[in-house]
């Protein structure tokens, strides 16, 4: 399996020997779950809901592992680094550019029509800009927002005009957001706050694409943050701390961002492809000296930005734009609607009483309690599927916040407000 350059979850059965091997790709881009029935027999499923009632505890199959003869074996720890590259910044940035371009090129090969999610942020904009250069005709891009003046719609429109894409804007309402909430929790099998927030917009835009186009493959910009840093990693106290945080985020991706991307896209009969998750690209970036990845330049993700600087891929104000989180950039009002709905859903007394029912990943806001109760409706007593709420590293100064959104950080840029 270590020789495969692919996104996969599989079970291979040898009928002659009556044996099988189960395996999952190193990042966990494709879903796979397992559990043991009352007789101790291991059961597998691509969706956790298929194991409800069959096993006592449902767990995600560990990425980069295969299972054979009752034992899990690690064939690839994608986040592990034996030694860092001994290269100067220009060489590193050149390699970043070439490897990301190669990652996009691989994922343009398809026997079905390919489309692109374009948020207007750095990551999805780079994927679209590279693809536009590689394509002989305009690519099809899609953006979503709560209103026509949503932050990212403005920037996505600017990128689309610059790269000459066939661009579609999907405008969603408060009612659409609230109506989709329970569906999103069920299809993802999560109670995580930021995953659910971001998934609603992605689910709705993918639903639109499925119902209104013949596109069947979608490229997205996930996994860049884990590699190059979030807004909160600006507060990393050292290069070693930055690297350890990046390793943790990569190892847990299958419970958060790539879970969102796969499920929201796949449930709408589309195939998710993630260029930033290209194995060669991930391995290379993880082995860059973390001293170079610290925000010492006044901008996060400096290496990624500099790699494409001055080459005409993107306008400077997009290439150097401050980050706006996807769930925020869809429209600040979306998160506000969800919070307001949760505030009315529970009284203060109900919140104080009901959150105590949970020991693992105890809800700490009315919004998180709402998501947890929806989760328990479909996945009773299965909270161990998610290790905890995705949150900034609270051990770092400046990161002890009570919300996963970058909006609450002191270094959140003006373009995201």
Region locations from a protein language model:
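ATP-dependent adenylate-handling active sites, centered on carboxylate activation for C-N bond formation
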Residues: 15-21, 26-39, 81-312, 326-341, ...
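Conserved catalytic micro-motifs used in adenylation/nucleotidyl-transfer and phosphoryl/amide-
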Residues: 1-74, 126-128, 218
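A short alpha-helix-loop-beta-strand transition element characteristic
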Residues: 57-60, 314-322
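Short secondary-structure junction motifs
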Residues: 5, 111-113, 321
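Acyl/amide activation-and-transfer machinery of modular secondary-metabolite enzymes
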Residues: 73-82
